[in-house]
Amino acid sequence: GRQLPNPEAHWLEAHTRSFNYPDTGRTVQLQDKASLGIKACFLSNSFAAYRLQALMAQGGFPAHLPLGEDTFTAAKLLLSGQSLRYQASAAVYHSHNYNGLQDFQRMFDTGVFHAQNPWLLQNFGKAEGEGAKLVKSQWAYLKAQASQPHHPNFLQGIVQLLSANVMKLMGYKLGRVHQWLPKALVKKFAMNKVFWQPKQ
């Protein structure tokens, strides 16, 4: 389903929701990865339904990930010949006003997820390309909206855009090489602290 930004969402977060969750539905199959790349297996972990038989045929949800169980499962389903349906007419309000540190931590976890699941990027392509598209879209949105009421002025918006995306990129890149970092530092960088606790 479609995620809409909460009324109090920051402009960057509101735009990211509209970028990731357009107002037009679509059905995605494995061959669509040629045009969609990593976005082919993009799925909402907070608003999705699964056919139980198809899900269990893939072993159900993975038990030990820092995040990304939705993307992991969607990719496995596509690779098994299943289709994904994005239903834009079904919508919920769901967004986060993360600060810079939280942006860093969230993307650090994403980097860890990609580093520990190289098959995902091997099959669907790198995430950086989609990130670059988002930044370009944010820039275009900022230029179009900067003069409107309730939007940041242009210079303030540039600072917000740059700072948020620099923190995200740094977090992601460090997450990709987390195995080379001191464990104490990894725990500080991670948003999902439980993932790094000793397993029982």
Each language-model region and where it sits:
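Conserved donor NDP-sugar-binding/catalytic core segment of glycosyltransferases
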Residues: 1-14
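Short, flexible, basic/aromatic active-site loop/helix in glycosyltransferases
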Residues: 1-2, 17-40
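Conserved nucleotide-sugar donor-binding
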Residues: 44-59
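Active-site phosphate/pyrophosphate-handling residues
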Residues: 53, 72, 91
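Acidic donor-binding loop at a coil-to-helix junction in glycosyltransferase catalytic cores
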Residues: 67-73
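Short active-site alpha-helical segment characteristic of glycosyltransferases
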Residues: 73-76, 82
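Active-site-adjacent helix/loop segment of glycosyltransferases
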Residues: 84, 91-168
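Juxtamembrane C-terminal module of membrane proteins
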Residues: 161-200
